[in-house]
C-alpha cells in the first residue's frame, strides 16, 4: 500500500513539474478593446527559449483604476494560473535592450509616458518622497513646460515665463525676462519691469489710493486729455 502511495505521489509531482509556471516572453502584438468594449487589453506573446506563441494573453494590474499596456517588442513576465498552459497571464515587465531602465535618484519615483518614447516625445513625472517639507512632484513636457509642486511651493515654467506660489513666504510671482508681477498675503501688489510698462483700457480707467499717491519721473512727464480737472 505504501508503495502505491509513493507511486501516486511521484506521478502527481511529475505532472506538476511538467506544467509551466512562469516565463519571459516578447510582445508580438497588442490588442485593444473594440468600440463596444467587448474585448479587453491583451497581447500576443512569444515565449523565450520556446517556439510557443500565446495569443491574446490578458494583462494583470496592481490597481484596477490604472492601465499601462506594453508595446510591441517589450519583454514581459508570463505566468500560468494553476499551472494551466491554456491560462497565461501577463503579470509584469522586464527592462531589456528595447527599453532600458531610466536614471532615478534615491527615494525618487519616475513615470514615463509612453514608456517606449524618446526624450523628445514623452512626458516625465517625478515624485520624491521624504519628510514633510522635502516632497516633490514634477511633470515635464518635451517642448519645455515644467510643473513642480513641493510641500511649500508651486512652480510653473514655460520658456522665460515663470510662475511661483510660495506658501511659506505668502507670495505669488509671475515673471518673464525683467518684468515681474508680485502679490503677497498682506494684499500688496508690485509691478516692475526693466523696460516699458503699458496700461491701456478700452473704456474707463480709475486709479485710487486711500492713502498717499506718488508719481515720479526722472525724465519728462506728459498729461494729455480732452479735458483735465485738478481738484
Kindly give the residue locations of the regions a language model identified.
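Hydrophobic packing positions characteristic
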Residues: 1-193
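Short, glycine-/Ser/Thr-/acidic-enriched flexible segments
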Residues: 32, 188, 196, 204, ...
Amino acid at each position: 500500500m505504501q508503495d502505491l502511495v509513493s507511486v501516486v505521489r511521484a506521478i502527481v509531482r511529475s505532472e506538476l513539474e511538467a506544467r509551466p509556471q512562469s516565463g519571459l516572453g516578447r510582445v508580438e502584438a497588442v490588442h485593444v478593446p473594440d468600440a463596444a468594449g467587448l474585448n479587453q487589453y491583451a497581447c500576443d506573446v512569444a515565449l523565450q527559449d520556446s517556439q510557443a506563441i500565446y495569443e491574446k494573453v490578458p494583462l494583470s494590474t496592481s490597481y484596477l483604476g490604472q492601465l499601462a499596456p506594453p508595446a510591441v517588442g517589450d519583454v514581459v513576465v508570463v505566468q500560468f494560473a494553476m499551472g494551466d498552459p491554456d491560462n497565461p497571464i501577463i503579470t509584469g515587465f522586464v527592462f531589456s535592450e528595447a527599453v532600458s531602465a531610466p536614471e532615478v535618484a534615491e527615494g525618487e519615483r519616475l513615470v514615463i509616458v509612453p514608456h517606449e518614447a524618446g526624450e523628445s516625445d514623452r512626458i516625465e513625472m517625478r515624485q520624491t518622497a521624504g519628510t514633510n517639507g522635502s516632497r516633490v512632484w514634477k511633470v515635464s513636457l518635451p517642448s519645455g513646460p515644467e510643473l513642480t509642486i513641493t510641500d511649500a511651493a508651486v512652480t510653473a515654467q514655460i520658456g522665460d515665463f515663470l510662475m511661483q506660489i510660495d506658501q511659506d513666504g505668502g507670495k505669488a510671482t509671475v515673471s518673464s525676462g525683467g518684468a515681474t508681477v508680485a502679490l503677497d498675503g498682506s494684499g500688496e501688489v508690485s509691478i516692475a519691469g526693466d523696460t516699458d510698462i503699458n496700461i491701456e483700457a478700452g473704456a474707463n480707467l480709475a486709479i485710487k489710493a486711500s492713502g498717499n499717491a506718488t508719481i515720479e519721473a526722472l525724465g519728462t512727464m506728459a498729461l494729455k486729455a480732452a479735458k483735465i480737472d485738478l481738484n
